[in-house]
């Protein structure tokens, strides 16, 4: 390899770029997960609880952030910047995995969930307002499973998918730090 080609970004030298590959994989997984969540909600009419909606935030963050990271990694951004971006994705995914596991534990009754979505903090107000609101509000409880596949709820799958995304980010970090 000549000194001229060694200064080019890895992609321009025909080499694989693990950071860009990891970021693109995370972006694709996050986008597919969001598409699945919206499919369940809009087509199958499996409505999300408040905790389910909050778990989507990590995916909403990951799609554009991972796309931007893949772009700058492919363009030869400084290694420290790319590693920091992958670390941010890994931490966001790990945090979401913990949140998903917590939610799955609430569904299994292992611990109590937030009172605003588990039905334990119900305040009926007056009898008249209660009757007026009964037909208007559909409360989706966080401690009731809306859908299971192979015995795992959507919150459980969120934890597993988030762990996969964190592992991909860690792989990208390990490969990038060795370059």
What are these regions (language model features)?
Residues 1-18:
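Short, Lys/Arg-rich, polar N-terminal cytosolic tail immediately upstream
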Residues 17-27, 75-97, 167:
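Interfacial segments of alpha-helical transmembrane regions
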Residues 26-33, 40, 65, 69, ...:
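Hydrophobic residues within membrane-embedded alpha-helical segments of Major Facilitator Superfamily
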Residues 32-41, 94-110:
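C-terminal TM-helix exit segments that contain a strictly Trp-centered aromatic cap at the helix terminus
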Residues 46-61:
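Loop-to-helix transition at the N-terminal end of transmembrane alpha-helices
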Residues 68-76, 170-177:
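Structural signal for the C-terminal ends of transmembrane alpha-helices
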Residues 108-153:
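Extracytosolic (periplasmic/ER-lumenal) interhelical loops and adjacent juxtamembrane/interface segments
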Residues 136-179:
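A hydrophobic membrane-anchoring alpha-helix module
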